[in-house]
A protein has these predicted regions:
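N-terminal signal peptide c-region/cleavage motif recognized by signal peptidases
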Residues: 6-8
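Surface-exposed binding patches on compact interaction domains or structured appendages
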Residues: 12-15, 41-99, 201
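Beta-sheet-dominated interaction scaffolds and their linkers
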Residues: 11-42, 47-49, 86, 161-172
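Short, solvent-exposed loop/turn segments enriched in Ser/Thr/Gly
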Residues: 25-31, 95-96, 108-115, 173-177
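Terminal connector regions
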Residues: 49-52, 102-151, 230-269
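Short proline/glycine- and polar residue-rich coil/turn motifs
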Residues: 87-94, 211-220
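Short, hydrophobic/aromatic beta-strand segments
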Residues: 40-48, 55-59, 110-111, 161-162, ...
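Asparagine-centered strand-capping/turn motif at beta-strand->loop junctions
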Residues: 34-40, 101, 181-185
Length: 269
């Protein structure tokens, strides 16, 4: 049984930090800490692949993977190595994994990407509802895979986004917001999108917020709950702000860029 989990969750009892890795060309190294707080050992394997987040046709987020990246892709997969790559992490044991970069000598300035995979095996989940008169219990062995973004920065790096096609609609008891974001510069854009629906008196009646990672372009769709009593008919304005800040990342890891603001009138019949 294989499960894909966010890093904030326990991967088969193994805790992983940090949940995003950025390596500078001057040091060419990074690290990852694994900790097993459980009572059973966990077999850990590390690997990497090239991929980046995109939006699907409905506006949801998904990870696009490229098995054999072409030369024009900024892939760091072939020259980032983890030490050790395999280990048995005992109960209450902590392990530091070193990440070493050996980029080509002619590497151009910019940002290069990889996805680090931490695969943890160990433990089991009992299968309920399986009757056995002999008293034999049934359980599934678990394998949990955690995917962590890795970015390698060399020389002058810059980023930003352009926003377009802002759209909004009231769908049942929610506000649905969608827009297109195109990245500028030579590095992924890490930021936060915030939206606020205000009435004619300037009162905020609904808000939406989401972290962003724009590697090329995307058209995310976000929803926010509306007041339980509903909204009266009339004109409202949606105000959207996209800023290069993230609550889940240290400020020094987020490349600064000018904020983007847009607005749209929303009419309720």
């Amino acid at each position: 049984m294989v499960m894909l989990l966010p890093v904030a969750l326990r991967a088969q009892g193994v805790l992983i930090a940090p949940h995003a890795i950025i390596i500078d060309h001057r040091t060419r190294s990074g690290s990852l800490t694994l900790y097993n707080p459980g009572d059973e050992p966990a077999e850990i394997t590390l690997s990497s692949f090239f991929g980046y987040p995109v939006s699907d046709p409905s506006g949801g987020f998904e990870l696009k993977t490229v098995d054999q990246p072409e030369p024009d892709y900024p892939s760091a997969v072939k020259w980032i190595e983890a030490f050790p790559k395999r280990m048995l992490l005992g109960p209450k044991q902590r392990q530091t994994v070193r990440l070493l970069a050996k980029p080509p000598a002619n590497l151009q300035d910019g940002e290069y990407w990889a996805r680090l995979v931490v695969n943890a095996k160990g433990g089991s989940v009992p299968v309920e509802g399986v009757a056995d008169s002999s008293g034999v219990s049934v359980a599934l062995a678990l394998e949990v895979r955690t995917i962590i973004p890795l970015q390698y920065r060399k020389g002058k790096v810059a980023t930003g986004v352009r926003a377009s096609r802002l759209d909004a609609a009231i769908e049942h008891d929610s506000l649905a917001v969608r827009l297109r974001l195109d990245r500028t510069g030579n590095a992924a854009y890490l930021g936060t999108l915030r939206g606020a629906l205000v009435d004619s008196a300037g009162k905020v009646v609904a808000t939406v917020s989401s972290p962003l990672a724009v590697y090329y372009d995307m058209e995310p769709r976000l929803t926010a709950p509306l007041p339980a009593a509903g909204l009266p008919a009339g004109r409202y304005r949606l105000k959207v702000d996209v800023a290069s800040e993230r609550q889940d990342l240290p400020p020094n890891l987020v490349l600064a860029s000018p904020p983007i603001r847009d607005s749209l009138e929303v009419r309720l019949p």
